[in-house]
Design a protein with these regions (language model features):
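Conserved N-terminal phosphate-binding loop of PLP-dependent enzymes in the Aspartate aminotransferase
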Residues: 1-217
C-alpha cells in the first residue's frame, strides 16, 4: 500500500534493511518477501557479517543519474566525504561474505531453519500460556509474552528480562525488545546465525522452554 501511495505522488520509496537484509529472512532482502520494489535500500550489519564495519545505500540507475550534472562525463557522479571513506576492507569483506552465503546455500538454510524455529515456538506456545503470539520470517522471529491472551496485556518487562537472563545462564543468547513504549517491551527476539543447524535451533527453544517454566511456573 505504501508503495502505491509513493508511486502515485512521485515519492521515492526508501526501505531500511539494516537489520533484516542480506539473508536474514531467507531472501537477500526482506522486502523481496512482499513484492515491493524500492528506489533506495540502506543496509549494514549482515553486509559483512560483522567481520568489518560497513554500511551502504543502494539505489537505481535512474535515481543515481539524478545526481549527475553531465551524464556523458564518467567522473561526474555523486560524492560524499566521511572519515572512513575509501576504506577497501569493508567492501572486500562484504563481497566475500555474500559469496559465502551463495556458495554455502545459506538463504535456503535460513528458510529451513526458520521454519523449524517457528514450529518449535508454536509448540512452546501450546505449552506456555504466557506466549501470546509468535511471528517472524526466516531466522528473524519473536515470541510475545502476555499476562492474558485475550486482552494481550503484556507481562511486566522485568519478567521478560528474567527469561533472557535465564537463557543467558544456560549459555543461550536471546534478545528482548527494549525500544518500544515503556511497559510494552515484552517480546523475545530470535536471530540465530544463518549457518544454524537443527540442533542449534532446538537448543535455543529448549533454553526458552526451561526459562519460561522457571520464571512463570
Amino acid at each position: 500500500k505504501v508503495q502505491e501511495i509513493c508511486r502515485r505522488h512521485d515519492v521515492l520509496l526508501h526501505i531500511d534493511e539494516v537489520v533484516c537484509g542480506v539473508g536474514r529472512t531467507g531472501t537477500w532482502f526482506g522486502y523481496q518477501n512482499y513484492g515491493v520494489e524500492p528506489d533506495m535500500v540502506t543496509m549494514a550489519k549482515g553486509v559483512a557479517s560483522g567481520y568489518a564495519a560497513i554500511a551502504c545505500l543502494v539505489t537505481t540507475e535512474e535515481v543515481f543519474d539524478l545526481f549527475k550534472s553531465d551524464a556523458t562525463d564518467p567522473m561526474d557522479y555523486f560524492r560524499d566525504i566521511s572519515t572512513f571513506g575509501g576504506c577497501t576492507a569493508g567492501p572486500a569483506a562484504a563481497l566475500e561474505n555474500m559469496a559465502i552465503i551463495e556458495e554455502e546455500g545459506l538463504l535456503e538454510n535460513t528458510t529451513a531453519m526458520g521454519a523449524r524455529l517457528m514450529e518449535n515456538l508454536h509448540a512452546l506456545m501450546e505449552k506456555h500460556a504466557v506466549i501470546g503470539d509468535v511471528r517472524g520470517a526466516g531466522l528473524f522471529c519473536g515470541a510475545e509474552l502476555v499476562a492474558d491472551r485475550v486482552s494481550r496485556e503484556p507481562v511486566a518487562e522485568k519478567l521478560a528480562q528474567a527469561v533472557t537472563a535465564d537463557c543467558m545462564a544456560q549459555g543461550v543468547i536471546v534478545g528482548v525488545t527494549n525500544r518500544s513504549v515503556p511497559g510494552y517491551n515484552n517480546t523475545l527476539c530470535f536471530s540465530p546465525a544463518l549457518i544454524a543447524t537443527p540442533d542449534d535451533i532446538d537448543a535455543i527453544t529448549d533454553a526458552v522452554d526451561g526459562a519460561l517454566t522457571r520464571v512463570f511456573g
